[in-house]
Amino acid sequence: MQAFDLYAILPELVLLIATCLLLVASVYVPERVTPTLGVEQDVFHTPRGVGFVYFFTIIMLVYLVFAFVGRMGDPALVAMNGLFQSDPFSNLLKACSCIAVLISLIYSKQYLMDRDLFRSDFIVLALLALLGQFVLISGANLLTLYLGLELMALPTYALVAMRHNSEKSVEAGIKYFILGALASGFLLYGMSMLYGVTGSLDLIEIFKVVADPRVNHLVMAFGLVFIVAGLAFKLSVVPFHMWVPDVYQGTPTAVTLMIAAAPKLAAFALLFRLLVNTLLPLLGDWQPMLVLLAVLSLVVGNVTAIAQTNVKRMLAYSAIAQMGFVLLGMLSVFDDHAFSASMFYAITYVLTTLGTFGLLMVLSRKGYDCETLDGLKGLNKKHPWFAFISLVMMFSLAGIPPTVGFVAKLGVLEALVDAEHSFIAVIAVIASLIGAFYYLRVIKVMYFDEPEHEVTVSGSGFAKGVLSLNSILVLAIGIVPAGLMSLCLDAMRRTLLGS
Protein backbone atom coordinates (compact mmCIF):
# COMPACT_ATOMS: atom_id res chain seq x y z
CA MET A 1 0.00 0.00 0.00
CA GLN A 2 1.45 3.36 -1.06
CA ALA A 3 1.47 6.43 1.15
CA PHE A 4 -1.22 8.28 -0.80
CA ASP A 5 -3.40 5.14 -0.64
CA LEU A 6 -3.19 5.22 3.14
CA TYR A 7 -3.95 8.95 3.19
CA ALA A 8 -6.98 8.50 0.94
CA ILE A 9 -8.57 5.81 3.10
CA LEU A 10 -7.36 7.02 6.52
CA PRO A 11 -10.79 8.20 7.80
CA GLU A 12 -12.36 4.91 6.70
CA LEU A 13 -9.58 2.99 8.46
CA VAL A 14 -10.12 5.00 11.64
CA LEU A 15 -13.85 4.27 11.53
CA LEU A 16 -13.31 0.57 10.79
CA ILE A 17 -10.76 0.04 13.57
CA ALA A 18 -12.79 2.04 16.08
CA THR A 19 -15.97 0.13 15.23
CA CYS A 20 -14.22 -3.21 15.64
CA LEU A 21 -12.78 -2.11 19.00
CA LEU A 22 -16.20 -0.93 20.17
CA LEU A 23 -17.73 -4.21 19.04
CA VAL A 24 -15.19 -6.16 21.10
CA ALA A 25 -15.52 -3.79 24.06
CA SER A 26 -19.30 -4.13 24.04
CA VAL A 27 -18.94 -7.83 24.87
CA TYR A 28 -17.25 -7.02 28.18
CA VAL A 29 -19.23 -4.00 29.36
CA PRO A 30 -22.66 -3.92 31.06
CA GLU A 31 -25.45 -3.11 28.64
CA ARG A 32 -28.24 -1.92 30.87
CA VAL A 33 -29.29 -1.19 34.44
CA THR A 34 -31.08 -4.05 36.21
CA PRO A 35 -32.17 -4.39 39.84
CA THR A 36 -30.17 -7.60 40.26
CA LEU A 37 -26.95 -6.39 38.73
CA GLY A 38 -27.16 -2.87 40.04
CA VAL A 39 -24.96 -1.55 37.26
CA GLU A 40 -23.48 1.82 38.16
CA GLN A 41 -24.38 4.72 35.88
CA ASP A 42 -22.04 7.34 34.48
CA VAL A 43 -22.30 11.10 34.13
CA PHE A 44 -24.47 10.61 31.04
CA HIS A 45 -27.04 8.74 33.19
CA THR A 46 -26.47 5.61 31.13
CA PRO A 47 -24.87 2.29 32.08
CA ARG A 48 -21.12 2.88 32.21
CA GLY A 49 -20.31 0.51 29.35
CA VAL A 50 -22.83 1.94 26.91
CA GLY A 51 -21.97 5.44 28.07
CA PHE A 52 -18.33 4.83 27.14
CA VAL A 53 -19.28 3.48 23.71
CA TYR A 54 -21.62 6.43 23.15
CA PHE A 55 -19.11 9.06 24.28
CA PHE A 56 -16.26 7.53 22.25
CA THR A 57 -18.51 7.40 19.17
CA ILE A 58 -19.46 11.06 19.50
CA ILE A 59 -15.79 12.09 19.78
CA MET A 60 -14.81 9.95 16.79
CA LEU A 61 -17.61 11.34 14.60
CA VAL A 62 -16.58 14.90 15.45
CA TYR A 63 -13.01 14.02 14.43
CA LEU A 64 -14.22 12.53 11.14
CA VAL A 65 -16.25 15.64 10.33
CA PHE A 66 -13.18 17.85 10.77
CA ALA A 67 -11.04 15.36 8.83
CA PHE A 68 -13.33 15.45 5.79
CA VAL A 69 -13.82 19.22 5.96
CA GLY A 70 -10.04 19.63 6.03
CA ARG A 71 -9.77 17.57 2.83
CA MET A 72 -12.23 19.71 0.87
CA GLY A 73 -9.43 21.63 -0.82
CA ASP A 74 -7.38 18.54 -1.71
CA PRO A 75 -7.12 17.38 -5.33
CA ALA A 76 -8.90 14.22 -6.41
CA LEU A 77 -7.11 10.97 -5.55
CA VAL A 78 -7.69 7.51 -6.97
CA ALA A 79 -6.29 4.93 -4.58
CA MET A 80 -6.20 1.18 -3.99
CA ASN A 81 -5.50 0.38 -7.64
CA GLY A 82 -8.51 2.31 -8.86
CA LEU A 83 -11.00 0.91 -6.33
CA PHE A 84 -11.38 4.04 -4.21
CA GLN A 85 -11.48 7.76 -4.95
CA SER A 86 -11.24 10.74 -2.66
CA ASP A 87 -12.46 13.98 -4.21
CA PRO A 88 -14.29 17.14 -3.08
CA PHE A 89 -17.65 15.54 -3.94
CA SER A 90 -17.06 12.53 -1.71
CA ASN A 91 -15.47 14.54 1.12
CA LEU A 92 -18.43 16.92 1.34
CA LEU A 93 -21.00 14.12 1.31
CA LYS A 94 -19.07 12.07 3.86
CA ALA A 95 -18.77 15.07 6.18
CA CYS A 96 -22.54 15.58 5.91
CA SER A 97 -23.16 11.86 6.53
CA CYS A 98 -21.02 12.03 9.70
CA ILE A 99 -22.96 15.05 10.90
CA ALA A 100 -26.26 13.28 10.18
CA VAL A 101 -25.28 10.17 12.16
CA LEU A 102 -23.83 12.31 14.97
CA ILE A 103 -27.03 14.32 15.34
CA SER A 104 -29.15 11.17 15.03
CA LEU A 105 -27.30 9.59 17.96
CA ILE A 106 -27.73 12.74 20.07
CA TYR A 107 -31.48 12.83 19.41
CA SER A 108 -31.90 9.09 19.91
CA LYS A 109 -30.18 8.59 23.28
CA GLN A 110 -33.06 9.37 25.67
CA TYR A 111 -35.65 7.89 23.31
CA LEU A 112 -33.80 4.56 23.20
CA MET A 113 -33.12 4.56 26.95
CA ASP A 114 -36.84 4.92 27.68
CA ARG A 115 -37.50 1.82 25.56
CA ASP A 116 -34.57 -0.28 26.82
CA LEU A 117 -33.02 -0.14 23.35
CA PHE A 118 -29.99 1.99 24.14
CA ARG A 119 -27.39 -0.71 23.71
CA SER A 120 -23.95 -0.75 22.19
CA ASP A 121 -25.11 -2.94 19.30
CA PHE A 122 -27.32 -0.08 18.08
CA ILE A 123 -24.31 2.23 17.96
CA VAL A 124 -22.04 -0.37 16.33
CA LEU A 125 -24.63 -1.14 13.64
CA ALA A 126 -25.03 2.57 12.95
CA LEU A 127 -21.25 2.93 12.56
CA LEU A 128 -21.03 -0.08 10.24
CA ALA A 129 -23.77 1.42 8.09
CA LEU A 130 -21.84 4.70 8.06
CA LEU A 131 -18.70 2.86 6.94
CA GLY A 132 -20.70 1.37 4.09
CA GLN A 133 -21.83 4.85 3.12
CA PHE A 134 -18.21 6.03 3.04
CA VAL A 135 -17.19 3.16 0.76
CA LEU A 136 -20.21 3.72 -1.47
CA ILE A 137 -19.67 7.47 -1.78
CA SER A 138 -15.99 7.00 -2.72
CA GLY A 139 -16.43 3.97 -4.96
CA ALA A 140 -14.47 4.14 -8.24
CA ASN A 141 -15.22 0.58 -9.26
CA LEU A 142 -18.44 -1.40 -9.68
CA LEU A 143 -17.23 -3.92 -7.11
CA THR A 144 -16.49 -1.19 -4.56
CA LEU A 145 -19.88 0.41 -5.13
CA TYR A 146 -21.69 -2.86 -4.60
CA LEU A 147 -19.69 -3.79 -1.49
CA GLY A 148 -20.33 -0.34 -0.03
CA LEU A 149 -24.02 -0.66 -0.81
CA GLU A 150 -24.30 -4.00 0.96
CA LEU A 151 -22.20 -2.85 3.92
CA MET A 152 -24.61 0.06 4.30
CA ALA A 153 -27.75 -2.06 3.84
CA LEU A 154 -27.06 -5.12 6.02
CA PRO A 155 -26.69 -3.23 9.35
CA THR A 156 -29.85 -1.25 8.60
CA TYR A 157 -31.81 -4.50 8.15
CA ALA A 158 -30.72 -5.48 11.66
CA LEU A 159 -31.56 -2.04 13.03
CA VAL A 160 -35.07 -2.13 11.59
CA ALA A 161 -35.80 -5.50 13.24
CA MET A 162 -33.95 -4.82 16.51
CA ARG A 163 -37.19 -4.51 18.53
CA HIS A 164 -37.80 -8.24 18.19
CA ASN A 165 -40.78 -8.28 20.57
CA SER A 166 -42.75 -5.97 18.27
CA GLU A 167 -44.70 -7.54 15.41
CA LYS A 168 -44.61 -4.30 13.41
CA SER A 169 -40.85 -4.00 13.77
CA VAL A 170 -40.23 -7.60 12.73
CA GLU A 171 -42.64 -7.27 9.81
CA ALA A 172 -40.92 -4.06 8.68
CA GLY A 173 -37.53 -5.75 8.95
CA ILE A 174 -38.62 -8.73 6.85
CA LYS A 175 -40.14 -6.49 4.16
CA TYR A 176 -37.08 -4.27 4.09
CA PHE A 177 -34.71 -7.23 3.87
CA ILE A 178 -36.58 -9.10 1.12
CA LEU A 179 -37.18 -6.06 -1.06
CA GLY A 180 -33.67 -4.76 -0.39
CA ALA A 181 -32.17 -8.07 -1.46
CA LEU A 182 -34.30 -8.00 -4.61
CA ALA A 183 -33.15 -4.46 -5.43
CA SER A 184 -29.52 -5.41 -4.81
CA GLY A 185 -30.00 -8.32 -7.20
CA PHE A 186 -31.35 -5.97 -9.86
CA LEU A 187 -28.40 -3.65 -9.41
CA LEU A 188 -25.86 -6.47 -9.45
CA TYR A 189 -27.41 -7.98 -12.59
CA GLY A 190 -27.25 -4.62 -14.35
CA MET A 191 -23.62 -4.19 -13.30
CA SER A 192 -22.79 -7.68 -14.58
CA MET A 193 -24.22 -6.79 -17.99
CA LEU A 194 -22.07 -3.66 -18.07
CA TYR A 195 -19.05 -5.78 -17.22
CA GLY A 196 -19.96 -8.28 -19.91
CA VAL A 197 -20.04 -5.56 -22.58
CA THR A 198 -17.11 -3.43 -21.43
CA GLY A 199 -14.84 -6.08 -19.90
CA SER A 200 -14.00 -3.79 -16.98
CA LEU A 201 -15.24 -2.94 -13.50
CA ASP A 202 -13.45 0.42 -13.40
CA LEU A 203 -15.83 3.37 -13.82
CA ILE A 204 -13.41 5.38 -15.97
CA GLU A 205 -12.77 2.46 -18.31
CA ILE A 206 -16.48 1.75 -18.57
CA PHE A 207 -17.10 5.39 -19.50
CA LYS A 208 -14.53 5.16 -22.30
CA VAL A 209 -16.09 2.00 -23.72
CA VAL A 210 -19.65 3.30 -23.43
CA ALA A 211 -18.64 6.47 -25.29
CA ASP A 212 -17.41 4.37 -28.23
CA PRO A 213 -20.17 4.36 -30.91
CA ARG A 214 -19.04 0.95 -32.15
CA VAL A 215 -20.12 -0.77 -28.94
CA ASN A 216 -23.47 -2.58 -28.80
CA HIS A 217 -25.58 -0.11 -26.83
CA LEU A 218 -28.66 -2.35 -26.84
CA VAL A 219 -27.20 -4.73 -24.25
CA MET A 220 -25.97 -1.82 -22.12
CA ALA A 221 -29.38 -0.17 -22.28
CA PHE A 222 -30.96 -3.42 -21.10
CA GLY A 223 -28.55 -3.57 -18.16
CA LEU A 224 -29.25 0.10 -17.51
CA VAL A 225 -32.90 -0.72 -16.79
CA PHE A 226 -31.86 -3.02 -13.94
CA ILE A 227 -29.37 -0.46 -12.61
CA VAL A 228 -32.00 2.29 -12.53
CA ALA A 229 -34.45 -0.09 -10.82
CA GLY A 230 -31.91 -0.82 -8.08
CA LEU A 231 -31.13 2.87 -7.69
CA ALA A 232 -34.83 3.70 -7.48
CA PHE A 233 -35.25 1.33 -4.54
CA LYS A 234 -32.32 2.84 -2.65
CA LEU A 235 -33.72 6.33 -3.29
CA SER A 236 -37.23 5.11 -2.34
CA VAL A 237 -38.95 6.48 -5.43
CA VAL A 238 -42.07 5.22 -7.23
CA PRO A 239 -42.72 2.43 -8.21
CA PHE A 240 -40.09 0.91 -5.89
CA HIS A 241 -41.41 2.67 -2.81
CA MET A 242 -43.81 0.19 -1.22
CA TRP A 243 -41.42 -0.67 1.62
CA VAL A 244 -40.96 2.91 2.78
CA PRO A 245 -44.24 3.65 4.67
CA ASP A 246 -44.26 0.30 6.51
CA VAL A 247 -40.60 0.57 7.51
CA TYR A 248 -40.93 4.19 8.66
CA GLN A 249 -44.03 3.41 10.72
CA GLY A 250 -43.03 0.00 12.04
CA THR A 251 -39.62 0.87 13.45
CA PRO A 252 -38.67 2.95 16.51
CA THR A 253 -38.32 6.60 15.54
CA ALA A 254 -34.58 6.53 16.29
CA VAL A 255 -34.11 3.73 13.75
CA THR A 256 -36.37 5.49 11.26
CA LEU A 257 -34.09 8.51 11.43
CA MET A 258 -31.02 6.32 10.84
CA ILE A 259 -32.47 5.06 7.55
CA ALA A 260 -34.19 8.30 6.53
CA ALA A 261 -31.24 10.70 6.73
CA ALA A 262 -27.61 9.74 6.01
CA PRO A 263 -28.33 6.82 3.59
CA LYS A 264 -30.07 9.27 1.26
CA LEU A 265 -26.74 11.03 0.69
CA ALA A 266 -25.03 7.74 -0.14
CA ALA A 267 -27.85 6.82 -2.53
CA PHE A 268 -27.46 10.18 -4.26
CA ALA A 269 -23.72 9.54 -4.60
CA LEU A 270 -24.41 6.12 -6.13
CA LEU A 271 -26.82 7.72 -8.58
CA PHE A 272 -24.24 10.32 -9.58
CA ARG A 273 -21.32 7.90 -9.83
CA LEU A 274 -23.20 5.46 -12.05
CA LEU A 275 -25.34 7.66 -14.27
CA VAL A 276 -23.24 10.82 -14.61
CA ASN A 277 -19.64 9.72 -14.02
CA THR A 278 -19.99 6.41 -15.86
CA LEU A 279 -23.03 6.21 -18.13
CA LEU A 280 -23.37 9.80 -19.34
CA PRO A 281 -23.10 8.68 -23.01
CA LEU A 282 -26.33 6.73 -22.40
CA LEU A 283 -28.12 9.92 -21.35
CA GLY A 284 -30.79 9.42 -23.99
CA ASP A 285 -31.64 6.07 -22.40
CA TRP A 286 -31.64 6.88 -18.69
CA GLN A 287 -32.98 10.43 -18.78
CA PRO A 288 -36.55 9.40 -19.79
CA MET A 289 -36.50 6.80 -17.00
CA LEU A 290 -35.58 9.46 -14.43
CA VAL A 291 -38.29 11.77 -15.75
CA LEU A 292 -40.91 9.05 -15.29
CA LEU A 293 -39.65 8.06 -11.84
CA ALA A 294 -39.44 11.69 -10.67
CA VAL A 295 -42.91 12.70 -11.88
CA LEU A 296 -44.54 9.56 -10.47
CA SER A 297 -42.78 10.09 -7.14
CA LEU A 298 -43.87 13.71 -6.91
CA VAL A 299 -47.50 12.93 -7.71
CA VAL A 300 -47.94 9.64 -5.84
CA GLY A 301 -45.93 10.74 -2.80
CA ASN A 302 -47.72 14.04 -2.27
CA VAL A 303 -51.23 12.80 -3.07
CA THR A 304 -50.96 9.70 -0.87
CA ALA A 305 -49.49 11.66 2.05
CA ILE A 306 -52.68 13.71 2.30
CA ALA A 307 -54.64 10.70 3.55
CA GLN A 308 -52.18 9.82 6.34
CA THR A 309 -52.85 10.52 10.02
CA ASN A 310 -49.68 8.82 11.24
CA VAL A 311 -46.93 11.45 11.07
CA LYS A 312 -44.14 8.96 10.35
CA ARG A 313 -46.15 7.38 7.55
CA MET A 314 -46.87 10.85 6.19
CA LEU A 315 -43.16 11.67 6.29
CA ALA A 316 -42.46 8.42 4.42
CA TYR A 317 -44.62 9.51 1.49
CA SER A 318 -43.10 12.97 1.82
CA ALA A 319 -39.64 11.40 1.44
CA ILE A 320 -40.77 9.71 -1.77
CA ALA A 321 -41.83 13.07 -3.19
CA GLN A 322 -38.67 14.79 -1.98
CA MET A 323 -36.47 12.21 -3.71
CA GLY A 324 -38.43 12.93 -6.88
CA PHE A 325 -37.08 16.47 -6.69
CA VAL A 326 -33.54 15.12 -6.29
CA LEU A 327 -33.97 13.13 -9.51
CA LEU A 328 -35.18 16.23 -11.36
CA GLY A 329 -31.84 17.92 -10.79
CA MET A 330 -30.10 15.10 -12.67
CA LEU A 331 -31.93 15.74 -15.94
CA SER A 332 -29.63 18.45 -17.30
CA VAL A 333 -26.90 17.49 -19.75
CA PHE A 334 -23.51 17.83 -18.03
CA ASP A 335 -24.58 20.97 -16.18
CA ASP A 336 -22.63 21.37 -12.96
CA HIS A 337 -25.14 23.95 -11.69
CA ALA A 338 -28.00 21.46 -12.06
CA PHE A 339 -26.06 18.64 -10.43
CA SER A 340 -24.99 20.90 -7.58
CA ALA A 341 -28.62 22.00 -7.13
CA SER A 342 -29.59 18.35 -6.76
CA MET A 343 -26.75 17.82 -4.28
CA PHE A 344 -27.78 20.92 -2.32
CA TYR A 345 -31.34 19.60 -2.23
CA ALA A 346 -30.26 16.21 -0.89
CA ILE A 347 -28.10 17.75 1.86
CA THR A 348 -30.71 20.26 2.99
CA TYR A 349 -33.45 17.62 2.92
CA VAL A 350 -31.36 15.50 5.30
CA LEU A 351 -30.89 18.53 7.57
CA THR A 352 -34.65 19.09 7.69
CA THR A 353 -35.36 15.40 8.21
CA LEU A 354 -33.03 15.35 11.21
CA GLY A 355 -34.97 18.16 12.84
CA THR A 356 -38.36 16.64 12.04
CA PHE A 357 -37.67 13.22 13.52
CA GLY A 358 -35.65 14.74 16.34
CA LEU A 359 -38.74 16.69 17.37
CA LEU A 360 -40.87 13.54 17.33
CA MET A 361 -38.38 11.86 19.68
CA VAL A 362 -38.28 14.85 22.01
CA LEU A 363 -42.09 14.81 22.18
CA SER A 364 -42.10 11.07 22.96
CA ARG A 365 -41.71 9.64 26.44
CA LYS A 366 -41.52 6.29 28.16
CA GLY A 367 -44.59 4.29 27.16
CA TYR A 368 -45.69 6.78 24.51
CA ASP A 369 -44.53 7.51 20.96
CA CYS A 370 -45.51 10.81 19.36
CA GLU A 371 -46.44 9.50 15.92
CA THR A 372 -49.95 10.77 15.14
CA LEU A 373 -51.45 14.14 14.34
CA ASP A 374 -53.54 13.88 17.52
CA GLY A 375 -50.33 13.77 19.53
CA LEU A 376 -49.34 17.17 18.13
CA LYS A 377 -52.62 18.92 18.88
CA GLY A 378 -52.25 22.02 21.01
CA LEU A 379 -48.46 21.82 21.10
CA ASN A 380 -48.17 25.61 20.83
CA LYS A 381 -50.17 26.10 24.04
CA LYS A 382 -47.83 23.91 26.09
CA HIS A 383 -44.48 24.23 24.35
CA PRO A 384 -44.46 27.16 21.89
CA TRP A 385 -40.74 26.88 21.09
CA PHE A 386 -41.04 23.28 19.94
CA ALA A 387 -44.17 24.16 17.99
CA PHE A 388 -42.12 26.84 16.24
CA ILE A 389 -39.38 24.30 15.47
CA SER A 390 -41.98 22.02 13.91
CA LEU A 391 -43.35 24.96 11.92
CA VAL A 392 -39.89 25.69 10.53
CA MET A 393 -39.38 22.05 9.51
CA MET A 394 -42.81 21.80 7.86
CA PHE A 395 -42.22 25.06 5.99
CA SER A 396 -38.88 23.75 4.77
CA LEU A 397 -40.32 20.43 3.57
CA ALA A 398 -43.11 22.32 1.81
CA GLY A 399 -40.66 24.74 0.20
CA ILE A 400 -41.97 27.91 1.83
CA PRO A 401 -39.61 30.90 2.30
CA PRO A 402 -37.50 31.86 4.16
CA THR A 403 -36.50 28.25 4.90
CA VAL A 404 -33.80 26.29 3.11
CA GLY A 405 -36.39 24.04 1.47
CA PHE A 406 -37.59 26.96 -0.65
CA VAL A 407 -34.07 27.72 -1.89
CA ALA A 408 -33.44 24.04 -2.66
CA LYS A 409 -36.66 23.65 -4.65
CA LEU A 410 -36.04 26.92 -6.47
CA GLY A 411 -32.56 25.78 -7.51
CA VAL A 412 -33.88 22.54 -8.99
CA LEU A 413 -36.70 24.34 -10.79
CA GLU A 414 -34.27 26.87 -12.27
CA ALA A 415 -32.10 24.00 -13.51
CA LEU A 416 -35.13 22.40 -15.14
CA VAL A 417 -36.10 25.61 -16.92
CA ASP A 418 -32.51 26.19 -18.08
CA ALA A 419 -32.48 22.63 -19.49
CA GLU A 420 -35.74 23.36 -21.37
CA HIS A 421 -37.82 21.06 -19.19
CA SER A 422 -40.36 23.75 -18.34
CA PHE A 423 -43.34 21.39 -18.50
CA ILE A 424 -41.75 19.10 -15.91
CA ALA A 425 -41.03 22.16 -13.75
CA VAL A 426 -44.73 23.07 -13.88
CA ILE A 427 -45.68 19.55 -12.77
CA ALA A 428 -43.18 19.81 -9.91
CA VAL A 429 -44.69 23.13 -8.78
CA ILE A 430 -48.22 21.72 -8.86
CA ALA A 431 -47.12 18.64 -6.91
CA SER A 432 -45.43 20.88 -4.34
CA LEU A 433 -48.62 22.89 -3.91
CA ILE A 434 -50.51 19.66 -3.27
CA GLY A 435 -47.86 18.62 -0.78
CA ALA A 436 -48.11 21.92 1.07
CA PHE A 437 -51.57 20.87 2.26
CA TYR A 438 -50.46 18.09 4.59
CA TYR A 439 -47.48 20.06 5.87
CA LEU A 440 -49.73 22.99 6.74
CA ARG A 441 -52.20 20.58 8.35
CA VAL A 442 -49.52 19.68 10.90
CA ILE A 443 -49.10 23.37 11.70
CA LYS A 444 -52.86 23.78 11.98
CA VAL A 445 -53.28 21.05 14.60
CA MET A 446 -50.36 22.44 16.64
CA TYR A 447 -51.55 26.03 16.68
CA PHE A 448 -55.34 25.90 16.43
CA ASP A 449 -56.52 22.57 17.88
CA GLU A 450 -57.03 21.84 21.55
CA PRO A 451 -54.75 19.21 23.11
CA GLU A 452 -56.44 15.84 23.64
CA HIS A 453 -53.93 14.67 26.24
CA GLU A 454 -50.92 15.93 28.15
CA VAL A 455 -48.11 17.09 25.86
CA THR A 456 -44.72 16.50 27.46
CA VAL A 457 -41.15 17.05 26.35
CA SER A 458 -38.37 14.56 27.09
CA GLY A 459 -34.73 14.34 26.13
CA SER A 460 -31.62 15.94 27.55
CA GLY A 461 -30.97 19.65 27.52
CA PHE A 462 -28.11 19.02 25.10
CA ALA A 463 -30.42 17.24 22.64
CA LYS A 464 -32.93 20.08 22.88
CA GLY A 465 -30.15 22.58 22.26
CA VAL A 466 -28.98 20.67 19.17
CA LEU A 467 -32.58 20.52 17.95
CA SER A 468 -32.88 24.29 18.37
CA LEU A 469 -29.62 24.80 16.48
CA ASN A 470 -30.92 22.47 13.78
CA SER A 471 -33.99 24.64 13.24
CA ILE A 472 -31.91 27.82 13.26
CA LEU A 473 -29.68 26.33 10.54
CA VAL A 474 -32.72 25.50 8.41
CA LEU A 475 -33.69 29.17 8.61
CA ALA A 476 -30.17 30.60 8.36
CA ILE A 477 -29.17 28.62 5.26
CA GLY A 478 -32.51 29.55 3.71
CA ILE A 479 -31.76 33.24 4.25
CA VAL A 480 -28.05 33.03 3.36
CA PRO A 481 -27.64 29.94 1.14
CA ALA A 482 -24.55 31.11 -0.75
CA GLY A 483 -22.02 29.32 1.47
CA LEU A 484 -23.42 25.81 1.14
CA MET A 485 -24.36 26.40 -2.50
CA SER A 486 -20.81 27.41 -3.37
CA LEU A 487 -19.45 24.34 -1.56
CA CYS A 488 -21.74 22.07 -3.57
CA LEU A 489 -20.95 23.83 -6.86
CA ASP A 490 -17.19 23.77 -6.26
CA ALA A 491 -17.25 20.11 -5.23
CA MET A 492 -19.34 19.13 -8.24
CA ARG A 493 -17.31 21.20 -10.69
CA ARG A 494 -13.94 19.88 -9.48
CA THR A 495 -15.23 16.31 -9.47
CA LEU A 496 -16.56 16.56 -13.02
CA LEU A 497 -13.24 18.02 -14.16
CA GLY A 498 -11.29 15.41 -12.19
CA SER A 499 -9.27 17.97 -10.24
Swiss-Prot record:
* A Pfam family the protein falls into: Proton_antipo_M
Subcellular location(s): the record lists: Cell inner membrane
**Transmembrane as UniProt keyword:** yes
- Domain of life of the organism in this record? Bacteria
What are the transmembrane regions? 9-29, 49-69, 88-108, 122-142, 143-163, 177-197, 218-238, 252-272, 280-300, 314-334, 343-363, 386-406, 423-443, 472-492
| Key words, A-Z | Cell inner membrane, Cell membrane, Membrane, NAD, Quinone, Translocase, Transmembrane, Transmembrane helix, Transport, Ubiquinone
One Gene Ontology term of the biological-process aspect is: ATP synthesis coupled electron transport
Catalytic activity, reaction form: a quinone + NADH + 5 H(+)(in) = a quinol + NAD(+) + 4 H(+)(out)
Where it mainly occurs, coarsely classed, is membrane
Give the multimer and partner information. NDH-1 is composed of 14 different subunits. Subunits NuoA, H, J, K, L, M, N constitute the membrane sector of the complex.
User: HAMAP family recorded for this chain?
Assistant: NDH1_NuoN_1
Family classification: Belongs to the complex I subunit 2 family.
Function of the molecule: NDH-1 shuttles electrons from NADH, via FMN and iron-sulfur (Fe-S) centers, to quinones in the respiratory chain. The immediate electron acceptor for the enzyme in this species is believed to be ubiquinone. Couples the redox reaction to proton translocation (for every two electrons transferred, four hydrogen ions are translocated across the cytoplasmic membrane), and thus conserves the redox energy in a proton gradient.
What PANTHER family is this protein classified in? NADH DEHYDROGENASE
This protein's name? NADH-quinone oxidoreductase subunit N
